[in-house]
């Protein structure tokens, strides 16, 4: 038995082609859904990036503050040469990295408190050195109005922005 041939006309071919493609409305709905998803994801990515920088800031502040405390402890123990009128805190941040002579070491070894000084992750000045990215408070300076002086008692961010918790970075 023979199957009859179906005669394909121009009209049936056009109908088949139209059924295989996307309509303009389907395309517009797809673009709208993708745009909606992107508008939700973009702010979340910005918050995640800011949160990452804030974690880096917390870590850097803790690292520098622990090094300053270690310097003060070494000074209190007499391992750093004492001079009349000094507070016992490092004169500059670079002293934490460059090291100081151990006064109790017969070989005059150096004591190092940091391997490298971290940059303030909130600093926008790419040309500044790591030390220049931090605000420095001296021992003689009041806590509510930090000023530089003869030593470095504490560090803070110079950024004017606020953290996700609503507290300005310079108050961390």
Where are these regions (language model features)?
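Short helix/strand-bridging catalytic loops that position acidic/His residues to coordinate divalent metals
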Residues: 46-52, 80-83
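N-terminal single-pass transmembrane signal-anchor helix
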Residues: 2, 18-45
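Exposed loop/turn and edge beta-strand positions of beta-sandwich/beta-sheet ligand-binding modules
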Residues: 27, 51, 149
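Short, functionally important structural connectors and interaction interfaces within domains
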Residues: 32, 41, 49, 106-109, ...
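Membrane-proximal N-terminal amphipathic helix
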Residues: 49-76, 88
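Low-complexity, acidic interaction segments enriched in glycine
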Residues: 69-172
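Intrinsically disordered, low-complexity linker/propeptide segments enriched in Ser/Thr/Gly/Pro
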Residues: 6-18
